[in-house]
Amino acid sequence: MEPYYNKISKALLKKFKEIVGEQFSFNDYEVRWTYAFGGSIFNKNWVPDLILIPKDAQQISKVLNLANKNRIPVTPRGSGTSLSSGSLSPYGGIILDLSQMNRILKIDIENNLVEVEPGVICDELNEILKPYGYFFPPDPGSSSVATIGGMVANNAGGIQAFKYGVTKNYVMYLEVVLPDGSLLNLGSNVLKSVSSYNIMDLFIGSEGTLGVITKVGLRIRPLPRARKLGLFIFKDVDDLQEAVLDLRRSGIIPNLLEFMDKLILKAVTEYLGGEFFDFPMGYVLLAEVDGKSLREIDEEFTNMFNIIIQKNPIFHKVAMNEIERERLILARKANLPALSRIRPNTCVEDCTIQISKFSEVIKKIEEIPKRINAKNLLVAIICHMEGNLHPTFLFNENDEQDVRDFQKAIDYLYREIIIPAGGSITGEHGIGKIKTSYLELEHESNVIELMTQIKKFFDPNMILNPGIGKGDSRELNTPNIKRSLKNQSNGIMELKCMRCGFCISCPSRMNYQLETYSPRGRLCLLNGLVHGDLELNDLIIEVFHTCTLCGLCQTKCPAGVNTIEIFEKAREIIHKNCEKS
């Protein structure tokens, strides 16, 4: 029998509010609207029915127990940066905003261990660990806002995965609340223990479908004291691949090995200017080694450099100090804002391949627009060189043909390139709400059935993050990507917000502890007002006037959205509307 869900009655609403407290429970439509958006460009007006902000595992246990008994869907959410719509709620129900469970509970240097709540931010954890000389190595592109709970749920990696691995390599133990409200303690605080089945690993990468993570024990490592970076440009991607394969054969393990294609280099050059104008166009390989001392890394870097140079790059530059290193790394970090200047919309995909098939796959991805006869669609490619590709599609969401071409391109990518190459449809972003239809291409039917059985064992009523493809094969409506403000007649400037969430470290958001009061939340409200989904009211007026116009969000925004100008203009329009009424 297909799972079914109930609406939240007034009586249930009262009970949920009693659990977390009135001030941490929100059912205003305007607040719920802002939680219908996340880091993905996709949405389908999946507006939740209730937002709850719990403070501990006991509150979460009571919420889940009540929700399970009454068949109310529950979706855990950290910072809402998922690029696969993982924290959106297609069936309504409750969003559990875990961002305020953000305490570091223990730092145990002697045992190389930290214990944290799920809402702790990755970069903030590393800032606190730095004086101890330790760090937590996984570093996703969203590390400035990514929560540890979200990183565990998606098994996040990052640009140092080539050497340091991904999140699962560092999780020692978890505290998890199951859908029925029961609490599990999994794993161990010692490095070796085989006294049970490895149940903990089921929850790492489960995307919040089996339980809600409420505590994480993480292994930490000594912070490297020295590092050295080189940038190499190749005319031919085959030569670049051979350089990487030779590095692997040598036993040298760079802490950073990153690829950028020609389109990204061109975009970054125009975006950053300066010395980048002296770089020839080609395929970029960024390679870095780190270690305990300059002497140690100088020898290893020289060996790495000599291996790469043998494959005849057309250009190379070695960072001689930290300032030069940061400048070269900026070429990698600036890819999204640079690409967003070419087309209004960017969609970053996520897939993995064997590195021995790298150049073959890159060439096929570059051919996608031609293969599907797309006139305006562009594709750029970035890659963590352990084999984790991020093809990025550039298009205009207000052009219906562009949208159709984009959707065809995604389909072609997975069906005609990644799966035939023996790859995986996701390496670190997750299946989310948008890749379920591709699961059967990668996994045999008995494996998918086993995933379904595991899901139903832990969550028989299917209340926890429904819509995620793992264990839930129900098809969702095709997500809608028309969600931003472009060329509006009411005078609001063009907006290129990617919903990435990098702006959520905002003073008013920190004060109100609610997504709605973040710059992204305000832009979502503006979106609703412009498209007629929302009507101006006192709450929306208050949200816009709590913005201090400090400009912090502008410094954080990869797309360069001029939030100050937009919010000032929005206030003017609000004032005019208030005067008329």
Give a label for each model feature.
Residues 26-37, 222, 231-234, 239-409, ...:
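C-terminal substrate-recognition/cap domain of FAD-linked oxidoreductases
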Residues 404, 476-494, 509-581:
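Ferredoxin-type iron-sulfur electron-transfer modules in oxidoreductases and energy-metabolism complexes
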Residues 381-384, 424-431, 466-469, 508-511:
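Short acidic/histidine-rich active-site segments
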Residues 182, 436-486:
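Activity-critical C-terminal alpha-helical subdomain
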Residues 82, 87, 151-152, 197-214, ...:
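Conserved phosphate/anionic-ligand binding catalytic regions in large, soluble enzymes, centered on
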Residues 1-65, 81-112, 141, 264-274, ...:
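N-terminal flexible segment immediately upstream of the FAD-binding catalytic core
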Residues 103-258, 464, 480-481, 488:
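FAD-binding subdomain of flavoenzyme oxidoreductases
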